Amino acid sequence: VVSERLAALGIEHQTGVGKTGIVAVVRGQTTNSGRSVGLRADMDALPMQEDNTFAHRSRYDGRMHGCGHDGHTTMLLAAARYLALTRAFDGTVTLIFQPGEEGYAGGKAMIEDGLFERFPADQVYALHNWPGLPVGKIAVRPGPMMAAADRITIDIEGKGGHGAHPHQAVDPVLVAGHIITAAQSIVARNVSPIDTAVVSLCAMHAGHPGAMSV
């Protein structure tokens, strides 16, 4: 879709950068300065089912834009259209449509594929939608704005048994509950209150819904 939109606007672009990334180039009315600025948006969706009934809901089962990357892509396409129609600047604007932002190292793949050797940029700008901000407002700050994240997976092995005889089992659900609660003290008691950190355990899989008493 992105490639089709860029082609319709007559914007030169390269597909397959970092496997599924797209890079477009818009040149200003003049390029005497030799300056080049990159604008980047992420494109990937999340592997989850969208249960909304909006007209703009995902058309693909098991995949949805739960983090607003469709909005980011739309904004970058709008910027591409405006820049291509006006070209009221000196230099070059590189439009970077990045895949695999949600934990799949799409940005790294593009860089390793020679992104900045093929499309040099003096600076690169990006943004993230923030529903809590009023329409028409943007928020900036010096220093880091968005945090990097690590993923953890904890496997708990218990001992099966019947819910009526908990003393004969080792209940992994109870253990998981204690871990989830205790994890919240990691930040509260190990990170300075003037620093920023978040620990979130966002999913738990335990037991079987078809066997409620086991």
Where are these regions (language model features)?
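Acidic/His- and Gly-rich active-site-bordering loop/insert found
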Residues: 1-65, 74-77, 81-89
